[in-house]
Regions:
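Basic Arg/Gly/Lys-rich low-complexity intrinsically disordered segments
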Residues: 70, 140-196
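Conserved helicase RecA-like core
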Residues: 1-159
Length: 196
């Protein structure tokens, strides 16, 4: 596992994929939008990638999976739901770009590599807000996940505690309400001014 900051996850992923031994990887993202964002980032780095998720048609998902199996793309980015039922032989690497909030999903994800007695490597990229998920996963699997020490993008942000999260959400909601109130005032003002 690599502990990093949320804003350095892409850089860390690019660093990990510089390792030429990682010829193909199934990468898990938490959301459909996140999966698409990761694919865009990888393509900017000239890494062939495709996403499979619920917003993709069945044909698009099958095409991406076939391209992955045919080694035409290096990284297949999937959400947990879209990955169910797919079978990929000789998959050596799985990357958890987003740590799942359900421990069982982690077990399901890492079970995708190293099947049929083959070795497999699971790599997880953990942001501060995901630290608690790692603790839950370690409780479920009854072992500590090895931490990569040679990490060029170490985690420096500490996760918010419960009180800080509440205050953050309260402030975010206050700012949102203020924004909409100002926008509505501006609209009303411009409509009055436009009627003269």
């Amino acid at each position: 596992i690599y502990y990093t900051n949320h804003n350095t996850k892409n850089q860390l992923l690019n660093y990990i994929l510089e390792d030429n031994r990682i010829d193909q990887v199934l990468l898990f993202a938490r959301t459909k939008h996140g999966a698409d964002r990761i694919v865009r980032n990888l393509k900017k780095q000239r890494i062939e990638a495709a996403a499979i998720h619920g917003d993709k048609s069945q044909n698009a998902r099958q095409r991406a999976l076939q391209q992955f199996k045919d080694y035409k793309i290096r990284v297949l980015v999937a959400t947990d739901i879209a990955s169910r039922g797919i079978d990929i032989d000789n998959l050596e690497y799985v990357i958890n770009y987003d740590i799942p909030n359900e421990s069982e999903s982690y077990v399901h994800r890492i079970g995708r590599c190293g099947r049929a007695g083959d070795d497999g490597i699971s790599i997880s990229i953990c942001g501060p807000e995901e630290n608690e998920y790692i603790r839950d996963i370690e409780k479920l699997i009854k072992q500590k996940i090895e931490v990569v020490k040679d990490n060029p993008f170490p985690q420096t942000d500490r996760p918010m505690n419960a009180r800080e999260k509440r205050e953050f959400e309260k402030e975010k909601n206050r700012r949102r309400q203020e924004f909409f109130a100002n926008r509505n005032r501006n609209r009303a003002s411009s409509q009055r001014g436009g009627n003269r």
